[in-house]
């Protein structure tokens, strides 16, 4: 029994897709356990970029099984489009498996997402308008439509009719918006269901059988710990649990079968959407990091907010997700800066604190306390070992590890697979 979970430790966009793709080389099964097509990940193979939103990164290994678990909310339209994109690029998807228990995102979820966000005005959350939140709402309210329902023509029609009638009353009466048409949704989405039918199965059985057989299973999280609905900057969060504990619920695998948790982070911090961000930069340094790091959302295309590395956030993520290993990405983006900073604690009303407050009002008053380190000017994109890094960059990496309290297993100096450097194998000693 060998399993590793990959989680984002910040607000998403840490490079999880790249690290998952890298670790997938030694895995036999790769599974997603939460989120939907609101999460974007970019994988670079032989210099070519592939952007995925729903399908696991392991799809690029045809001999390995890629799983979309029951905790994922699936937009069939997006899934079919993504499958077509991969097929056009010559990538086989015969190794994909989709949970029959996963819930389905339908057009009324997306419409409701937009209407709710618009109604919030200045208090908007910054949702990607992908229908993720409303789909999880239906799931919790026990009125959601699952993949198993989508494949059954009569059941899908019955449940869609009931749900759409309720949603249309909401659109017309509360939001003064037009109703959606049952026939067009039913025909379009039932057809999508038939297209993906061959991939659908009980993925919990596949995952548990693989683990019981001693195979290596890699679980891929979406978003990041600070977007977790319980442990993140609520309400500026996603509607699921990206923390490692979400694996057990979203994949149907018990907690006793999880061995290691790899926390992925960047050498700085970024965030898309609204919400607290104590180390955010508004100066030319922030602009430089954004441009050099190409900090624009994979899903939204929106410029990401950027800031210095925040060890308070990282220690929070380590604690609530049980992180055992750290993967530090994008060190190269900081090259050329005379000074680099790390937030070591916060000043809250004159008091030094080293924890991340739950209160948004307190977070607004938190001022980062920085430790300054000398920067480096060298181009490090070709570095292939820790010893090859300039001394100042090497000291920065070590200081990050010390402050977070987790050993670094890999570090990256660029987007390519070959730019990921291994300090220790996360698959070893399991």
From Swiss-Prot:
Pathways per UniProt: Purine metabolism; AMP biosynthesis via de novo pathway; AMP from IMP: step 1/2
Any Pfam family hit: Adenylsucc_synt
Positions of GTP binding: 12-18, 40-42, 304, 330-332, 412-414
InterPro entries to which the protein is assigned, alphabetical: Adenylosuccin_syn_GTP-bd, Adenylosuccin_syn_Lys_AS, Adenylosuccinate_synth_dom1, Adenylosuccinate_synth_dom2, Adenylosuccinate_synth_dom3, Adenylosuccinate_synthetase, P-loop_NTPase
Gene Ontology terms for molecular function: adenylosuccinate synthase activity; GTP binding; magnesium ion binding
Cofactor entry: Mg(2+)
Catalytic residues in the record: 13, 41
SUBUNIT field: Homodimer.
Protein name: Adenylosuccinate synthetase
Native source organism of the sequence: Streptococcus uberis (strain ATCC BAA-854 / 0140J)
Encoding gene (name): purA
């Amino acid at each position: 029994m060998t399993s590793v979970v990959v989680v984002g430790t910040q607000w998403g966009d840490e490079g999880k897709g790249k690290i998952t793709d890298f670790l997938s080389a030694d895995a036999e099964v790769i599974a997603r356990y939460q989120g939907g097509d609101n999460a974007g990940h970019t994988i670079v193979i032989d210099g070519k970029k592939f952007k995925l939103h729903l399908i696991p990164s392991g799809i690029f290994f045809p001999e390995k099984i890629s799983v979309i678990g029951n905790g994922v909310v699936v937009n069939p339209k997006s899934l079919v489009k993504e499958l077509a994109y991969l097929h056009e690029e010559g990538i086989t998807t015969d190794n994909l498996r989709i949970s029959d228990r996963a819930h389905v995102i339908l057009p009324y979820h997306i419409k409701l997402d937009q209407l709710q966000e618009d109604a919030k005005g200045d208090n908007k959350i910054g949702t990607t308008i992908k229908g993720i939140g409303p789909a999880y709402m239906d799931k919790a309210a026990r009125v959601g439509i699952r993949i198993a329902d989508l494949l059954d023509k009569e059941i899908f029609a019955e449940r869609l009719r009931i749900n759409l009638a309720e949603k249309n009353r909401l659109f017309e009466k509360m939001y003064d918006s037009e109703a959606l048409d049952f026939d067009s949704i039913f025909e379009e989405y039932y057809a999508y269901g038939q297209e993906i039918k061959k991939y659908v199965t009980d993925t919990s059985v596949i995952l548990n059988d693989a683990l019981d057989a001693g195979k290596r299973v890699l679980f891929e999280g979406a978003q990041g710990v600070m977007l977790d609905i319980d442990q993140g900057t609520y309400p500026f969060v996603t509607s699921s649990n990206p923390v490692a504990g979400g694996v057990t619920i979203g994949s149907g695998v018990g907690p006793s079968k999880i061995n290691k948790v790899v926390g992925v982070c960047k050498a700085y911090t970024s965030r898309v959407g609204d919400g607290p961000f104590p180390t955010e930069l508004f100066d030319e340094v922030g602009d430089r990091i954004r441009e050099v790091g190409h900090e624009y959302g994979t899903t939204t295309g929106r410029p990401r907010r950027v800031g210095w590395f925040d060890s308070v956030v990282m220690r929070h993520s380590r604690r609530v997700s049980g992180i055992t290993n750290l993967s530090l990405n994008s060190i190269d983006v900081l090259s050329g800066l005379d000074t680099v900073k790390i937030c070591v604690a916060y000043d809250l009303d004159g008091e030094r604190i080293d924890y991340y407050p739950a209160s948004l009002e307190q977070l607004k008053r938190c001022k980062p306390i920085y430790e300054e380190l000398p920067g480096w000017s060298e181009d490090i994109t070709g570095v292939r070992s820790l010893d090859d890094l300039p001394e100042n960059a090497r000291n920065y990496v070590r200081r990050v590890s010390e402050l977070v309290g987790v050993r670094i297993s890999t570090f990256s100096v660029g987007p390519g697979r070959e730019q990921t450097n291994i300090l220790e194998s996360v698959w070893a000693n399991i």
